[in-house]
């Protein structure tokens, strides 16, 4: 295969409360290697103002921008999907719906569901292993008691101590300015059936462990790996929960290796 034929379309999916902006260090590095890169804003995230957070109560609604992108791809095009943190659930949904359009999916310290439990299984496990005190000034709220979706937003203290503790202070300050409330859609995830073996389970998965992640600790990451083993496990030992900021060069090197090896 020629070098030109190896160039891939890489799709980057952000985690909770963030947006496409969080990939600003990664996107140009991948493009410099010749790849086409699309960073997606999920619904009511980043600079997406076309949807209101009060209108989002399901995973489909939250993931709609990613699904629209996948639908628009030609039938003969396959992408490299990369998801971070909560974005792993949107990745899984895309894999389940469009398995033939994805060459490989990369879970970057991301929630990686299995094909036996409901998608909320991985989130519920994290919440059980994390006390409310550890979330510090993160706000979990609802617009009104009978609203079916819970909103949450990371607080600045939580971001500084647990999300960005090894990242440049400039990136932490940028994030403080740009994070938005995120729909938790927990009820929908809990009621949803498991992802299928024929769809989600058929796509090659790679997991990138972040060794200094205080939000999704390494033990939690490896429990997801043991529960539903991916094709390969890679590691960035000194990355916090935000490797695109704390270790962008190492993350890009792994993504380039994955694209070359599996796409």
UniProtKB/Swiss-Prot annotation:
InterPro entries: AB_hydrolase_1, AB_hydrolase_fold, MES/HNL. Keywords: Hydrolase. The active site is at 85 (acyl-ester intermediate), 213 (charge relay system), 241 (charge relay system). PROSITE patterns: LIPASE_SER. GO terms for molecular function: hydrolase activity, acting on ester bonds; methyl indole-3-acetate esterase activity; methyl jasmonate esterase activity. It comes from Arabidopsis thaliana. It catalyses: methyl (indol-3-yl)acetate + H2O = (indol-3-yl)acetate + methanol + H(+); methyl (-)-jasmonate + H2O = jasmonate + methanol + H(+). Belongs to the AB hydrolase superfamily. Methylesterase family. Pathway: Plant hormone biosynthesis; Lipid metabolism; oxylipin biosynthesis. Pfam families: Abhydrolase_6 (PF12697). Its EC number is 3.1.1.-. GO terms for biological process: oxylipin biosynthetic process. Methylesterase shown to have carboxylesterase activity, methyl indole-3-acetic acid (MeIAA) esterase activity and methyl jasmonate (MeJA) esterase activity in vitro. GO terms for cellular component: vacuole. Gene3D superfamilies: alpha/beta hydrolase (3.40.50.1820). This is Methylesterase 3.
